[in-house]
Amino acid sequence: MRIAVVGMGKIGLPLAVHYARGGHTVVGVDVNPGVVALINEGVEPFPGEAHLAEYLPPLASSGALRATTEYAEAIPGADTVVMVVPLVVDNESRPDFRVMDAATRSMAAHLTPGTLVSYETTLPVGTTRGRYKPLIEEVSGLIEGCDFDVVFSPERVLTGRVFADLARYPKLVGGLSEAGEAHGVSFYEAVLSFDERDDLPRPNGVWPMGGAEAAEMAKLAETTYRDVNIGLANQFARYADAIGINVARVIEACNSQPYSHIHRPGIAVGGHCIPVYPRLYLAGDPDATIVSAARAANADMPAYAVSRASALLGSLKGLRVALLGATYRGGVKETAFSGVFGVVDALREAGAQVSVHDPLYADDELAAFGWDAYHLGEPVDVAIIQADHAAYRNLVPADLPGVRLLVDGRAITSPEAWVGTSRITVGGGSAPAC
C-alpha cells in the first residue's frame, strides 16, 4: 500500500515508521522543514522514542519512508491518508481547530478518488462527521462514501513506547457509514498486529465501533476517566493532609478490593492528553460537572503543593527554592502542560527565588523558558520534586546543601533517607515544623 501520514511528530513519525517496516511505501508530511530534513537523513528528530533511532535509518536510506513539506508529493494516489496533527485548546479551554483545519484543507486539495482518510488525532464528539467530512468534500469536490471514505481511529499510544503500544491495545475504528467503517477496519488489519490478551472481553485486534462518534467518545472517555480519577485521588490527598493521615495507605487498602481502582495523587497532571482531552469532552458536554470539577482540582495542585511548603515554613519570601523536574513525566523530554509552569508561578507569587533542574535539559534550554538553572550540590532552602525522573529517586539531603524542606510531589524518594530533614508528600499527612 501507499500510505501518507500527515504530521511527523512524536506519534506520527513512529506510525509512519511502523507502516514502512511492514513493507508499505510511506510519505510523511510536516510543515517543519527541519524535521523533514532530519527524517530524510535517517536522524531521529526528537530522541526518547524506544527503537525509533534503530528503525528509522534503513527506511530512510531505502526510500521506504520519506518526508516532505509538500502535500502534492504525498496525497495524490495514496491508498490511505492518516491524519496525526495536534489539536490543542486555547486559553479559555476551547478546542483550537486552526492547525487541523489547515492540514485538512491542504490534504483535501490533493485528495484522489478511492482514498481512505483516517483521523487519529483526538477530536470532540461529532467533529469527524460534522466538521471534517464537509470540509474535505468542499475543498476536494469529491463525495464521502462514494469517492473516498473517512474514519476516526484514535491513537492510543504513549510517547516513548509507541511501537509496543500499537500491539498492546485494540485499535478502535468508527466510520461515517457501514462500508466506510469496513474500509477502515480492512486497512488497520493490514498494517497492525496485536498481542494476545486474556483480560479483554473479545480478542485483541481491530474493533469496529459502529460509527465515528462512538470512537471519538471512547478516546475522550478513557482519558477523561483518568483525569477524574486522579482528581478524586487528589481530593482524598488534600483531606488526608488536613486531618494528618497518609493517603497512600488508604488508597492501597481501598485497591485491595477488586472494585476500587483509585489512582495516585500528585503535584500535577501534565502532557498532551490527560489535561487536554477532558476539555475536548466538555466542548460537547459542558454540563458534565464531575469532569469540570476534577479538571479544576487537578489544575490547582501545583499551587496547593506550594501552599503547603509556605504554611510549614511560615513564608517562602526570599527563600531559595529548587524545582526538580521540568517535564510532565519522568524520562520524557516534553513540557506540554507540565506542572512546572504552575509551580514556578506560585513560587514567584510567594516571593521565592526559583531555579529549575532537569536531567534532560541543558542550562540554556531552561533559560529559554525564563528559568534560572539549578545544579545539585548548590545551596538551597526548599526543594520540590515535580517530575518523577529516576535520578531523583535516590536523592538525599546532602545533594541539596542547606535544604530545610523537601516537597516530594511524586512520592518517589525514600522516607528513611530524609530522617532529620522535613519531607512531605501530596497526601502524606502532617509534617513537623521546619
For the regions a protein language model found, what residue spans apply to each?
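Structural/interface elements that position substrates and couple domains in central-metabolism enzymes
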Residues: 1-434
